[in-house]
Amino acid sequence: FGEKLSLIPVASPDYIREAGEPDTPQSLVNFRCINRCFPDGEKYRWEFIGPSGELSEVAVKGDLVVDADSAMIQAAESGLGIAFVYQSLVTQQLSAGSLVHLLPGYRYPADHFCVYYPSRKHTPAPLRAFIAWVMAQNKNILGQQTARHRSRPED
């Protein structure tokens, strides 16, 4: 069901010259990162799968918080820190050299996705059908996500 989305950490060459490069996801806490937050204000934790398959989640540090990919990319290109963005959105910048892919030995666990909707109490039939279809199309990758979906309390 569609192409897997992959988030990657990127930074400008100028930022890397100034601050150096992280060697593990955990070392990102020592760098200025450009954060993204959820609607409730909680900051997004960066997730990685390492070369040996281990999963790590990092609560990065940084004062700049944005809610748009374009702003995050522009901030990274301007040398304001490390951004965690969809690889498909920065292919031109990576090719041009204005951004550098950091931690290339690590990958984002792109086997999950979210469907946001206002309430589970009175979900319209077409939306329920769509969710069922998406879950059926992705049954081989859902695992924990299916359990999470079912265990959420009713709104």
State what each model feature region is.
Residues 1, 24-26, 37-38, 55-56, ...:
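Short secondary-structure boundary/capping segments
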Residues 56-101, 108, 123:
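Hydrophobic hinge/microswitch elements
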Residues 14-23, 54, 120-125:
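Short helix-loop capping/hinge motifs at secondary-structure junctions, enriched
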Residues 32-52:
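Secondary-structure junction motif
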Residues 26, 73-74, 128:
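Alpha-helical segments flanking ligand/cofactor-binding loops in enzyme cores
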Residues 10-11, 67, 85, 134:
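A conserved hydrophobic position in a structured secondary element of the catalytic/binding core
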Residues 87-92, 96, 106-155:
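C-terminal effector-binding regulatory domain of bacterial HTH transcription factors
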Residues 1-6, 10-36:
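Flexible hinge/capping segments at coil-to-helix
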